[in-house]
């Protein structure tokens, strides 16, 4: 992230985003920011199979790192020093255990916008549970409501909770935080 990508254009051109997001809404949020010109670097775990959707994966570079190793953590810290935005979608406490939580990174880079997204929030009875669209619609009863007259429920093809709720609200929150930072 030390060299600007001069081929990018759009209102977020020059904005540097570091993505530790995994699957679903995090990569979708990063895609939205990249579509508006941000320079996005996705940190992919070693041995990971990557996000399988080339549409959602567009507009970014990928770096493979073992962020659990000392070298991977140090490289991540260096990248965060040069970033404007960080996106992460791990369960609560994961980034803190790795030494990459918001307190640690904001101490080193006070201008960093730390975009954190979890399915159930950072605290509460479901905080440590995995959060995925299918869980939300099952828990709320929406999945049962969309089944036919007989047979099992059929999950919808679109992931409204992950993409319509998670990624869009994270993108709006990041843009609002950037606006506030620059005022």
Where are these regions (language model features)?
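Basic/polar N-terminal segments that are highly enriched at the extreme N-terminus
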Residues: 1-10
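Conserved small-residue-rich beta-alpha loop and adjacent elements
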Residues: 9-47
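Glycine-rich phosphate-binding loop and adjoining beta1-alpha1-beta2 segment
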Residues: 35-66
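Active-site-adjacent "lid/gating" segments in soluble enzymes
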Residues: 32, 36, 98-183
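Short glycine-rich, flexible loops that bind phosphorylated cofactors or substrates
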Residues: 26, 94-96, 122
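A structured beta-alpha segment of the ubiquitous adenosine-cofactor-binding alpha/beta core
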Residues: 18, 56-107
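Short glycine-/small-residue-rich Rossmann-like dinucleotide-binding loops
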Residues: 22, 67, 91-92, 118-119, ...
């Amino acid at each position: 992230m030390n060299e600007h990508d001069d081929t990018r254009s759009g209102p977020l051109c020059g904005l540097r985003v570091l993505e530790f997001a995994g699957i679903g809404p995090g990569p979708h949020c990063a895609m939205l920011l990249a579509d508006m010109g941000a320079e996005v670097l996705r940190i992919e775990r070693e041995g990971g199979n990557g996000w399988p959707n080339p549409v959602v994966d567009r507009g970014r570079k990928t770096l493979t790192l073992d962020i659990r190793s000392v070298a991977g953590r140090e490289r991540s810290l260096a990248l965060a020093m040069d970033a404007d935005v960080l996106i992460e979608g791990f369960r609560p406490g994961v980034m803190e255990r790795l030494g990459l939580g918001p307190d640690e990174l904001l101490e080193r880079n006070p201008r960093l916008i730390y975009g954190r997204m979890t399915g159930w929030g950072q605290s509460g009875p479901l905080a440590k549970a995995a959060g995925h669209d299918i869980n939300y619609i099952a828990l709320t009863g929406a999945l049962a409501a969309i089944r036919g007259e007989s047979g099992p429920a059929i999950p919808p093809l679109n992931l409204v909770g992950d993409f319509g709720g998670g990624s869009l609200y994270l993108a709006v929150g990041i843009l609002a935080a950037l606006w506030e930072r620059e005022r």
